[in-house]
């Protein structure tokens, strides 16, 4: 059915085979055309999924040919859409490769990941502004982080030493002196599609925007990535000479604040299981970083005037 509907989205489209990739949230199929080219045809089943797909389509349109030409890997490319019962059916290029598995990352693959991240962060920001993608300054990033810390502190569930660690990071003006870049915005291991030891595609760009490049590195600072993250960061820095001095420290900070966000999500929505899970994660983080200078976010604290100081 999806392959037949695809002809309305892409005139002249001729499917010869289709493989279902459907989930409870969406109908989807991997479709091959008469030229043996692979396409992804999707149709949301739920309103939340429709909203997600709309965000993906918007980001895909912002990934212009000019931006794509600067990347050594493939990204989603939307070829057509059509309305089906009030929802949007889309036809896009099927991205090749297999999802990155952290336990199987070799030094060569780690270098490829670092290079891919650097390429994203070196894209010109002007194109995203032309497409009205969100833009967050360094000061905006600091204010967001400080807001999360303040809200988490108000729960009374943070160990005092962990709270002070986060407050110190917010108070360090040097940590927040960086140039914003194009960022993926939802980066994690599963976004990378690989062929052998090379990154061949990156998916899920719905949060594409201008912001702190450290956000795209946060996933690397979690314990499960420790076996290869140093190699990724080394490759990233060698591929992007303009990377700021404290990008790795901010990446660690954003990863820690993700735990605070999880805690706040549970509290805001009254989900006890989430609150319990997040509280355990907070304690585990506290135990891991307490007294370990290798885990420091800022050392020493900058003496520069704080950006929010009046």
What are these regions (language model features)?
Residues 1-10, 289-310:
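Regulatory N- and C-terminal appendages and interdomain linkers associated
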Residues 2-8, 42-86, 101-115, 119:
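A conserved alpha-helical element in kinase catalytic cores
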Residues 8-35:
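ATP-binding glycine-rich phosphate-binding loop
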Residues 24-34, 40-41, 170-215:
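Active-site acidic catalytic loop and adjacent metal/ATP-binding pocket
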Residues 74-77, 81, 99-156, 180, ...:
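A cross-family kinase active-site recognition segment
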Residues 85-98:
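Conserved short submotifs of the Hanks-type protein kinase catalytic core
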Residues 195-244:
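Active-site Asp-x-Gly
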Residues 224-289:
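A conserved long alpha-helix in the C-terminal portion of kinase-like catalytic domains
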